[in-house]
């Protein structure tokens, strides 16, 4: 998703959205079999509720199932056996999203020195996994050097997050198509350009380089049209951002979200689909096809709109 200057100011109260995420694959020859798996169902949490969800696949799959992974993400599997040249996957959701708790960014751990957010003891044991580097490694000397100006000793955690998001937003250019899902953080550092996935992964590497537990979050961001303009259907996109684990009292924890693509902290405009250690844990779609096709085209459209109903209709 691109950085968008038309984002509205944070809203008050719970908001209901309808999300339509459509992916179409077109092939130059017949595909005889398609296996797919995707993370397309919004999560349920204390501040988010998936009111309704429908996944439509055309041609209809001969086999499909739904499961939940170790991080609590909902995964959808399908196998299409009908010969086809076009495969369309449409995910429709109705989601309620509430604002962050009062004080999440203005009191408690957010105002404590960032060093205090490093996982420790039993409360932090489940978060330790999110402090670890990836394979191949992404925490390099270049990442540590880039992170250093934000992580001043004893600086309040929320100031670190705001500063890191702001620096990435300022130092890097959003350029669609400039990277792929296999582009590493250090390549992005050198090129100084990328997309939301790259900026989220850079922020995560910086946080982990300093011992904090950070996760990759995939989902959607509700945006407003420019003043005086009608909302255009399908212009939104999947989005990605970072979250850092913080210990709360007593024996609780919270994830504080930062969005370096748009230079802001996460609020009720953000709809969470998946959480993981990296993009590879929660890709919207991936799969295997059997075909002699030499070429393929993929079209993706996403629409996130305020909604007042409580049911999905055709």
Swiss-Prot record:
SUPFAM superfamilies to which the protein is assigned, alphabetical: Cysteine proteinases
UniProt keyword Lipoprotein present: no
Modification N-acetylserine occurs at: 2
Cited InterPro entries: Bac_transglu_N (IPR013589), Papain-like_cys_pep_sf (IPR038765), Transglutaminase-like (IPR002931)
GO cellular component terms listed in the entry, alphabetical order: plasma membrane
Keywords noted in UniProt: Acetylation
Statement: the UniProt record of this protein carries the keyword Translocase: no
Span of the signal peptide: none
Disulfide bonds: none
Domain of life: Bacteria
Family as reported in the entry's similarity comment: To M.leprae ML0607.
PANTHER family: BLR2979 PROTEIN (PTHR33490:SF7), BLR5614 PROTEIN-RELATED (PTHR33490)
Protein name: Uncharacterized protein Rv2569c
Organism annotation: Mycobacterium tuberculosis (strain ATCC 25618 / H37Rv)
């Amino acid at each position: 998703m691109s950085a968008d200057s038309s984002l509205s100011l944070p809203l008050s109260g719970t908001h209901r959205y309808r999300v339509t995420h459509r992916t179409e694959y077109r092939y130059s020859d017949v595909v005889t079999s398609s296996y797919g798996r995707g993370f397309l169902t919004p999560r349920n949490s204390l501040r988010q509720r998936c009111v309704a969800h429908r996944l439509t696949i055309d041609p209809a799959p001969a086999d499909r199932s739904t499961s939940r992974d170790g991080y609590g993400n909902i995964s959808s599997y399908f196998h299409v056996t009908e010969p086809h040249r076009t495969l369309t996957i449409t995910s429709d959701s109705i989601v309620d999203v509430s604002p962050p708790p009062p004080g999440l960014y203005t009191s408690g751990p957010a105002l404590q020195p960032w060093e205090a957010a490093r996982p420790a003891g039993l409360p932090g044991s489940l978060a330790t996994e999110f402090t670890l580097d990836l394979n191949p490694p992404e925490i390099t000397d270049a990442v540590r050097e880039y992170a250093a100006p934000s992580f001043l000793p004893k600086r309040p955690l929320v100031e670190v997050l705001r500063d890191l998001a702001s620096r990435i937003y300022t130092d890097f250019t959003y350029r669609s198509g400039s990277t792929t899902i296999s582009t590493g953080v250090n390549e992005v550092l050198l090129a100084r350009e990328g997309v939301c996935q790259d900026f989220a992964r850079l922020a995560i590497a910086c946080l982990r380089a300093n011992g904090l537990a950070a996760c990759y979050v995939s989902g959607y961001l509700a945006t407003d049209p420019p003043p005086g303009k009608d909302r255009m259907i399908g212009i939104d996109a999947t989005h990605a951002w970072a979250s850092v684990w913080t210990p709360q009292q007593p024996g609780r924890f919270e994830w504080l979200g930062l969005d370096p693509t748009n230079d802001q902290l996460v609020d009720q405009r953000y709809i969470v689909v998946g959480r993981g250690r990296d993009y590879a844990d929660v890709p919207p779609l991936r799969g295997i096809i059997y075909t002699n096709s030499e070429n393929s085209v993929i079209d993706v459209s996403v629409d996130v709109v305020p909604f007042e109903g409580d049911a999905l209709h055709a």
